[in-house]
Swiss-Prot record:
Purpose of the protein: Phototransformation of protochlorophyllide (Pchlide) to chlorophyllide (Chlide). PORA may also function as a photoprotectant during the transitory stage from dark to light. Functions in skotomorphogenesis, photomorphogenesis and throughout the plant life under specific light conditions.
Name listed for the protein in its UniProt record: Protochlorophyllide reductase A, chloroplastic
Pfam name, any one: adh_short
Note from the entry: The presence of TOC33 is not required for the import of PORA into plastids.
Organism: Arabidopsis thaliana (Mouse-ear cress)
Amino acid sequence: MALQAASLVSSAFSVRKDGKLNASASSSFKESSLFGVSLSEQSKADFVSSSLRCKREQSLRNNKAIIRAQAIATSTPSVTKSSLDRKKTLRKGNVVVTGASSGLGLATAKALAETGKWHVIMACRDFLKAERAAQSAGMPKDSYTVMHLDLASLDSVRQFVDNFRRAEMPLDVLVCNAAVYQPTANQPTFTAEGFELSVGINHLGHFLLSRLLIDDLKNSDYPSKRLIIVGSITGNTNTLAGNVPPKANLGDLRGLAGGLNGLNSSAMIDGGDFVGAKAYKDSKVCNMLTMQEFHRRFHEDTGITFASLYPGCIATTGLFREHIPLFRTLFPPFQKYITKGYVSESEAGKRLAQVVADPSLTKSGVYWSWNKTSASFENQLSQEASDVEKARRVWEVSEKLVGLA
């Protein structure tokens, strides 16, 4: 009976999706009865209730759709901005590292390549040596490009910049790392333009390179653009190592202003007699002064981070290859066990890579160092290495020497 009743009722009427009765169902419904009881009035009430319930449910569905649409419309700008920001960081960063065929430069290139987030342009004097070094270090082939750069020739610096631009790669970070150190030299040697070699390579070559590439850094869309110049504790006379004779001293820059050619001027920045170890230390003071002057002239308008660093004493580096054999033998254990300042090339490379890429090291105008637990900190520079007026004068004289003024 229950099934029969249900069949009679379902055949008697049907309801459209919008909650209204079909016409045929309505007329049939008026004349129907079940078990002698009229269904007309009761069914009318039931269908009115059903119709209202359907309308309420439809209204709720419509309201939810409107709310979802409003939420999407409201969040669209931020989603779009976020996606654009992500697109900026999806590509690998491009970093130029000078002197990347050995020592600190190679260790840095390797550390950056291993992250998978950087493409390293190895700017080196010896192309084949750099290629072999990258392969020996296990750097993936697509993680680096070797390009020729001889910092002892300003023409080579200009040619490197031209070749780099022809490659149509953006420049996101420039690392000025290459250096020459002649601690036992009694007579100066000179660059192609006639500058004393240590200052010519370590300072003037990098100065021209940085000045020419500053526009490329400005044009980068990378989130954190940086220019890093490697300094040295030996040029910082407020440290124990910086007070080991001969100490760095730029004097009144008379030798630099005279061209450092050893002919009509001294080959030393301060105008004194040539001392190979001092020439290196003086060049490092110039590096640190130049970094600070870049910061003052460009950081506020460009957002580029300018920094210098001393990654620790890499006592086994090839930088000391021209020292006497006894020094090369005793210096590493002395640094490792007495001063505790020794770091391996690998560790130093990781520290420099940290200054290249670490989001926590974006402060500009800073000279970074590391403590014995390998934690980075802002170190203080000596009075001369932080002299604002001297930095300005070094900048202006250097511009003239490299042909920019």
